[in-house]
A protein has these predicted regions:
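Domain-level signal for soluble alpha/beta catalytic cores
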Residues: 1-484, 490-840
């Protein structure tokens, strides 16, 4: 199947997927702990019959049972060498079932999911290794005859991108992708539905959507959000409600086919046009939704508005149109002219990069430009490190800025959002090499109207260059909305008409539907009091239609002027933005005054008087003598390192704190523990997501490793409470379990982590040998949660007094109560609170 054929196939009527595979195989006798693909091949008729029933029920796209048939997952069963033959035989089952069609077209989708290994910086997996793993599986699926590919049940947008990139590089099959969202409308890694939809459509997915986690009604908001920012078909593949265990310990779901079908109407109304079922659904579910919606044409829901552009990080989307409010692309993460930043980058230190990112976001930037162009460093490696560090402290979308195509390609490949590329000109190398790369990764780009001949001699030549690049972009599948034209600002000191020419370019671009950008500082080069010139020019440019500018958002006069101009032009919500910014200006001034007072007081303590200079700031060079206690300042610095997840810098900060006279026990109890507790609160409130939680926990762990020898030297002999933690037998998921272990360690527990797929006997034996106060159990699958019941019962029978706490995606408080566990934890932060409460 070609992508064009897929578009034609899905354009008029609702399309039907199949329902659950795993829960039906369990009913048919598949035990937990086995390799699902191997069991299917050993019980071929069971799978064939199930898929034939789906086809008879009305399925148009049948998922081949290759869900975890990748090298990493199969290696857990020592079957990785059999991957190719296994995939070939598994796809053959689905092809045979699809051939038994009752008269409607049926296509077989090669099924792909997460590997279970996490990408850097949260895990150890490198992006290129992950892409290679997916390529191996995809090539096997293509060779086996899959008609299309499905990437499903994804919790990570970055890993979903890796799968799409792999597919794009080895085949031309259409790829559909669905992610799994939590109750808060975000994936486990913090991506919302709009952001996922924008990124995956721009990367070339033929259809996108959601599967698993919830029943149909709870999926409505996710589907609506995806529909509102895309033009491709939207998939809805919900569970049959919520799981529970019946009196026999069998996993069941709380929705019957009739109720499920009724609720699916909500998703159809929201704009879903490809329907199916996930956990707990059967061929009868598919039959009923097919009977309900089979002859209906697609519901026309509100799709992506005309002319709206989208830039994203991994976690948020910034949308804008030509008549929306002006915004700033922060320019400060650029070593040009910044000696301190250059020195840090040569040392591999990214503290100032992080500082500039945080400051620019606080000052109102909506996008951050990242430029690592300088001598004496590996620019590509520094760019990738900067992306990692900046993405860890801000959710703002990024602009990728380099003179080298290979640097931009590496950045686009690794960046897990939709970036802005700065920039593409008509210069031969960038035009011929860079533009196809931008198109491949679905980015937006700044169109710089330069050619090999240099600057255009007049506005007409500038227009000609713009349209040449635009035409080439269209031929690569891009749209006008993917382009931001640079107005090419020259200095008014050398060319008195420079401002007028740029303003004419801006007006021309807006009238022709192009977004625009410019670098403000060029206009005032070599002029006195440059800020006045920049601000006046910005006012004129916004009135002419300027969309955004690359500038320093910490310049209050410039930012205030921009927001006031929007206000006077009566742009939507301009008054609210102006009032909000003005309030922030007041707060920042008060903070500066307080900082001034604090530093003056510190100097006076040493008998040094410093008179105010008329400014509200004191140079950062003004510090107290080295022998001055800096307890408050050092504590705040260490706390910030935990809150920001500064894994690399916190060791240095901890050592500095110790050298300044801080006591290890006070750093632990008064700084680190309160900081990580605050991180947990932010996570509970939805301010932080899994990446920030992991980064902060690892930062704290690195700090504790410095303190631990000093703490042990002077401790009172009090033993730490022992926790034996494991993912139960048959379950190979450990993301959540690993984080719980890390958080418990950070709070002073002695954690014995047994890993994943751990037999009951080993868990109980370890608990007895180590006199554990707690046994912590994790399960992600409904097929393995029964192991928890068995462990609780066995522990009581053997007289083990350790308190048993449980958690995992399918676990609830009700289930914990039912099996007699001592507690249930919904996440890592909650696990710490639970353990402490059970010790009281």
């Amino acid at each position: 199947m070609t992508r064009e054929k897929f578009i034609d196939f899905t354009k008029d009527h609702i399309i039907y997927l199949d329902g659950a595979t795993g829960s039906n195989l369990v009913k048919a006798g598949m035990p937990s702990g086995v390799c699902p693909e191997q069991w299917i091949l050993e019980h071929r008729e069971v799978m064939l019959q199930l898929q034939k029933e789906y086809v008879q029920a009305g399925t148009n796209i049948l998922y081949a049972p290759t869900f975890t048939a990748n090298r990493v997952k199969l290696a857990e069963y020592h079957l990785e060498k059999n991957m190719s033959s296994m995939i070939h035989d598994l796809v053959a089952i689905s092809k045979e079932a699809a051939a038994d069609t009752p008269g409607h077209p049926v296509y077989v989708a090669g099924d792909i999911t997460m590997t279970g290994e996490q990408l850097r910086p949260m895990g150890k997996m490198e992006l290129e290794d992950l892409i290679a793993i997916y390529k191996e599986q995809i090539l096997c699926l293509v060779d086996a005859g899959a008609d299309l590919l499905v990437v499903e049940t994804m919790m990570s947008l970055a890993e979903t991108r890796a799968a799409l990139i792999a597919a794009k590089e080895v085949c031309d099959l259409p790829v559909i992708a669905t992610l799994t969202f939590e109750a808060d409308g975000r994936t486990l890694f913090g991506t919302d539905a709009k952001t996922a939809a924008v990124v995956l459509e721009s990367l070339g997915a033929s259809a996108i959507g959601a599967n698993c986690s919830t029943g149909p009604a709870q999926m409505e908001g996710i589907i609506s959000d995806m529909v509102s920012v895309t033009t491709i078909p939207i998939i809805a593949k919900p569970n049959a409600g919520l799981p529970f265990l019946d009196e026999n310990g069998t996993t069941c779901y709380n929705m019957e086919a009739e109720e499920f079908t009724e609720e699916m109407q909500v998703l159809v109304n929201a704009g879903a046009t490809i329907l199916g079922g996930c956990c707990g659904t059967t061929p009868e579910f598919i039959r009923q939704i097919h009977d309900r919606f089979g002859t209906e044409t697609r519901v026309t829901a509100a799709r992506r508005p005309e002319g709206i552009r989208y830039l994203t990080s991994e976690r948020i989307t910034h949308s804008f149109g030509l008549d929306d409010g002006f915004f700033v692309v922060g320019e400060r993460i650029n070593p040009t002219g910044k000696k301190a930043l250059q020195a840090q980058l040569r040392e591999g230190n990214f503290e100032k990069v992080i500082q500039f990112a945080e400051e620019q976001e606080a000052c109102g930037a909506k996008v951050l430009d990242i430029n690592m162009g300088m001598s004496g460093i590996d620019e590509k490696l520094c760019m990738l490190r900067a992306l990692e560090e900046v993405s860890g402290v801000t959710n703002l979308p990024l602009s990728l800025d380099s003179s080298y195509v290979e640097v931009l390609e590496a950045a686009l490949r690794n960046y897990p959002g939709r970036a802005l590329v700065n920039s593409v000109s008509l210069e031969t190398e960038k035009f011929e090499k860079l533009l196809p790369i931008v198109a491949k990764y679905g980015a937006m780009f700044i169109l710089l109207p330069l050619s090999d001949a240099g600057l255009p001699k007049d506005i007409e030549e500038k227009k000609e260059i713009i349209h040449k690049i635009y035409d080439r972009a269209l031929s690569l599948g891009m749209r006008k909305e993917d382009i931001v034209v640079d107005g090419l600002v020259a200095t008014v000191g050398a060319n008195p008409k420079a401002a007028l020419e740029t303003l004419e370019t801006i007006r021309y671009c807006k009238s022709n539907g192009f977004a625009t950008i410019c670098g403000l500082s060029n206009i005032s080069f070599a002029m006195p009091e440059r800020g006045f010139v920049n601000t006046a020019f910005l006012t004129l440019a916004i009135q002419a239609g300027l969309t955004m500018a690359i500038a320093n958002p910490s310049q209050e006069m410039l930012m205030s002027c921009a927001l006031a101009t929007d206000l006077l032009l009566n742009k939507e919500e301009a008054a609210l933005r102006y009032i909000e910014y003005a309030g922030g200006v007041k707060e920042r001034r008060e903070e500066k005054e307080a900082e001034l007072s604090r530093k003056l007081a510190l100097l006076e303590q040493q008998g040094t008087k410093a008179a105010p200079t008329g400014n509200t700031e004191v140079s950062s060079a003004v510090t107290a003598p080295k022998d001055t206690p800096q307890i408050n300042e050092m504590q705040e610095k260490l706390k910030t390192a935990v809150l920001k997840g500064n894994r690399n810098g916190i060791v240095k900060i901890t050592n500095e704190a110790l050298e300044s006279g801080e006591k290890p026990v006070e750093l632990l109890n008064q700084v680190l523990l309160p900081a990580i507790n605050l991180v947990g609160e932010y996570f509970d409130q939805g301010k932080y997501f899994l990446p920030q939680l992991i980064a902060s926990a690892e930062a704290m762990k690195n700090s504790i490793e410095v303190l631990e020898p000093l703490l042990q030297t002077g401790n009172s002999g009090e033993e730490m409470p022992v926790v034996v933690i494991a993912t139960v037998e048959g379950d190979i998921h450990d993301i959540g379990k690993n984080l719980v272990a890390l958080m418990l360690k950070n709070h002073g527990f002695h954690v014995i982590d047994l890993g994943k797929d751990v037999p009951q006997a080993k868990i109980l034996e370890t608990a007895k040998e180590n006199h554990a106060e707690f046994i912590a159990l994790s399960a992600l699958m409904t097929t393995t949660m029964q192991r928890m019941r068995e462990i609780v019962a066995a522990a009581k029978q053997e007289g083990i007094t350790a308190k048993i706490i449980i958690g995992g995606a399918v676990i609830t408080q009700e289930y914990a109560d039912e099996i007699g566990a001592d507690g249930y934890s919904k996440d890592a932060a909650d696990a710490v609170k639970l353990a402490k409460s059970l010790m009281e």
